[in-house]
Regions:
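P-loop/Walker A NTP-binding region and its immediately flanking N-terminal helices
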Residues: 1-124, 132-133, 139, 143, ...
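A Lys-centered signature of the CheY-like receiver
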Residues: 127
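General structural signal for secondary-structure boundaries
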Residues: 1, 51, 130, 182-184, ...
Length: 205
């Protein structure tokens, strides 16, 4: 959090590599940064656009054209899907446009990113919060959306989706009917996790 605050206060960022499990908020953090500093930005989902030609063309066109802001930022989401050849091309582009363009790379598997790119970035592992925190977050979302729920159902959903926070939230959305969170009674919940979640939710008042 302290690093993010420094970046937001300074209005400047280095090249960043955000890595960690799916659903832990890497893309959300990247977009938070670009939306709160004075920059033009380009978002590329590298799992869909991962070839040498696409990476080179999109990145080069954006980085080399005149923008409205002094700084440009390129978010390459899921960049562990980029082919090794495309990563080599990306490394060269990062060097060529380093004066006016920053890169934020996100990935699940940092070992798939070539060393020359890793060495040019400040790397941060995004670690998921614990189950209790996820349960509290989900409870807050449901409360804000005026959705009625039973704490046992919160436990079920968290246990089924953790540590993927996105999966937890999406799972809850699918179970909401008429502003009520309803879980199939046949869903199995491990008692130890249920008790932990119930404990934190009972003390939220």
């Amino acid at each position: 959090k302290s690093k993010v605050s420094v970046y937001l206060e300074s209005g400047d960022i280095p090249h960043l590599l955000l890595f960690g499990r799916a659903g832990t908020g890497k893309t959300t953090l990247a977009k938070l940064l670009v939306n709160n500093i004075d920059c033009d930005y380009l978002y590329i989902n590298a799992s869909d656009e991962n070839s040498v030609d696409v990476v080179r063309e999109k990145v080069k066109n954006f980085a080399s054209t005149l923008g409205f802001k002094d700084m440009k930022v390129i978010i390459l989401d899921e960049c562990d899907y980029i082919t090794p050849n495309a990563q080599a091309a990306l490394r060269n582009l990062m060097e060529t446009f380093s004066k006016n363009c920053r890169f934020i790379l996100t990935c699940n598997y940092v070992e798939r990113i070539i060393d020359p790119i890793q060495s040019r970035c400040q790397s941060f592992q995004i670690v998921p919060p614990d189950r209790k925190q996820v349960a509290q977050h989900l409870a807050n979302i449901l409360t804000n959306e005026n959705v009625q729920y039973d704490v046992k159902d919160i436990a079920t959903i968290v246990n089924g989706g953790y540590p993927d926070i996105r999966r937890v939230i999406n799972g809850a959305q699918r179970q909401v009917v008429n502003s009520q969170l309803t879980i199939d009674e046949n869903t199995i919940v491990q008692n130890d996790y249920k008790l932990e979640v119930l404990e934190i939710l009972k003390t939220q008042d």
